[in-house]
A protein has these predicted regions:
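Hydrophobic transmembrane alpha-helices and their immediate loop junctions
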Residues: 1-166
Length: 166
């Protein structure tokens, strides 16, 4: 864990907690006044922020597992202020392997989106966490698929170009 991660987690938790009414509205949930008082906003914010960073970690683990399948070791996974990175020993020379490794992280995020979206939690703290983490994982997948390096989408684009190269 990078020091910036340890600094941002409580700040993100506080931000989410202070804006819970807006999040409930955004997620289409009825507001529960009990969750907006006392320690509950910060605790919900802390759970949501922790879920966000665990989602980023699982996204990066997806890359690491796909890389290992192709014999590419992952030196480390680092979580920091702006997300995470799986540092691999090398980039595979075969474009198809790079493509699979690049798509593995967004695929994990999409699977997490589907999992959280499928949960039967309709309201309250669990409803908030389920819908928040569904939205976060969908956003994580879509953002990472933007075709710009160093994002996964940039690596996908590079691999696709290499596959088309004569």
């Amino acid at each position: 864990l990078d020091l910036s991660f340890l600094l941002i987690l409580p700040l993100w938790a506080l931000y989410i907690g202070r804006n819970l009414p807006h999040y409930f509205a955004l997620l289409g949930l009825p507001q529960d006044p009990r969750l907006l008082q006392g320690p509950y906003p910060f605790l919900l914010g802390l759970l949501a922020a922790t879920g966000l960073f665990l989602s980023v970690l699982l996204h990066e683990v997806g890359h690491a597992l796909a890389a290992r399948r192709y014999g590419v070791a992952t030196r480390r996974i680092t979580l920091w202020l702006l997300g995470g990175v799986a540092q691999m020993e090398r980039i595979p020379r075969e474009p198809m392997k790079e493509l699979v490794i690049a798509l593995a992280g967004p695929l994990v995020s999409l699977l997490l989106f589907l999992l959280f979206r499928a949960l039967p939690w309709e309201a309250g703290a669990l409803g908030f966490l389920g819908r928040y983490l569904a939205l976060v994982n969908l956003g994580l997948a879509l953002f990472n698929l933007l075709p710009a390096l160093p994002l996964d989408g940039g690596r996908v684009y590079r691999a696709l170009l290499a596959l088309r190269k004569p």
